[in-house]
Amino acid sequence: MKDLENMALLIDFYGALLTPRQQELMQAYYLEDLSLAEIAGEGGVSRQAVHDLIKRSEASLHEYEAKLGFVREYRQRQQTLALLEAALAEGDLVRARAAVEELKAE
């Protein structure tokens, strides 16, 4: 599930940088949960062709993340927000203030 979640985030953040065909295949495979055979049948191409294009698209998305780091930054912010919420729920203003300062520093 973690891999699917990670790929969904990569598609959300960087999907627009893929070609329209890559976007279509990644959407079908990861977000619509279609099999390689189903995608190949709909597109009139071989299963291997779909597999190869998906693998190239995945590599491109990972490369974009390595260079830009938007997903990493998003996850860090989400983690800090969770800490802030927990600190506020516990009434721990020192931890809450530290979390706010961390968010401001980003």
Provide a role label for each language-model segment.
Residues 20-32:
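Short amphipathic alpha helix immediately N-terminal
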Residues 79-106:
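Helix-turn-helix/homeodomain-like alpha-helical modules used for DNA recognition
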Residues 67-79:
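Short, basic, alpha-helical segments at the C-terminal edge of helix-turn-helix-like DNA-binding modules
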Residues 9-18:
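Short amphipathic alpha-helical boundary/capping segments
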Residues 46-47:
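Helix-turn-helix DNA-binding motif, specifically the short coil turn and the N-cap/start of the second
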Residues 25, 39-40, 50:
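Hydrophobic positions on the alpha-helical face of helix-turn-helix-like DNA-binding modules
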Residues 58-65:
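C-terminal flanking helix
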Residues 53-56:
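Residues within the DNA-recognition helix of helix-turn-helix
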